[in-house]
Amino acid sequence: MKTLILLSALVLLAFQVQADPIQNTDEETKTEEQPGEEDQAVSVSFGDPEGTSLQEESLRDLVCYCRARGCKGRERMNGTCRKGHLLYMLCCR
């Protein structure tokens, strides 16, 4: 059941990212990727702030990063993340 809810949340996130129009502006196309920006730490939480049964130890230990060039080592791609108008891969371990 927890897996189903987690997968549903990731699917909804993917649909939301695809639904938002990506607008290319002159400034954006001129902007080069800055060094060090490919590894942005992301906090991932599920449920309400007071906690639910979803926030068990296995989910609290989930660490995710927004990466531009693919996941590293033991990480797996779990969707996408956005910084401004740029899309990155959401890599979690």
Swiss-Prot record:
Pro-region residues? 20-60
Q: What is the effect of changing D61Y?
A: In strain: C3H/HeJ
Chain positions covered by the region annotation Disordered: 23-54
- Give the keywords, sorted: Antibiotic, Antimicrobial, Defensin, Disulfide bond, Secreted, Signal
Per the record, the GO terms for biological process are:
cellular response to lipopolysaccharide; defense response to bacterium; defense response to Gram-negative bacterium; defense response to Gram-positive bacterium; response to xenobiotic stimulus
Which organs or tissues contain this protein? Paneth cells of the small bowel.
Which domain of life does this protein belong to? Eukaryota
Record localization: Secreted
A GO CC term assigned to this protein in UniProt: extracellular space
Q: Which InterPro entries match?
A: Alpha-defensin (IPR016327), Alpha-defensin_C (IPR006081), Alpha-defensin_N (IPR002366), Beta/alpha-defensin_C (IPR006080)
Query: What is the stated purpose of this protein?
Result: Has broad-spectrum antimicrobial properties. Has antibacterial activity against the Gram-positive bacterium L.monocytogenes EGD and the Gram-negative bacteria E.coli ML-35p and avirulent S.typhimurium 7953, but not against the mouse-virulent S.typhimurium 14028S. Probably contributes to the antimicrobial barrier function of the small bowel mucosa.
UniProt lists the family membership as follows: Belongs to the alpha-defensin family.
What is the name of the protein in this document? Alpha-defensin 6/12
Gene (UniProt): Defa6
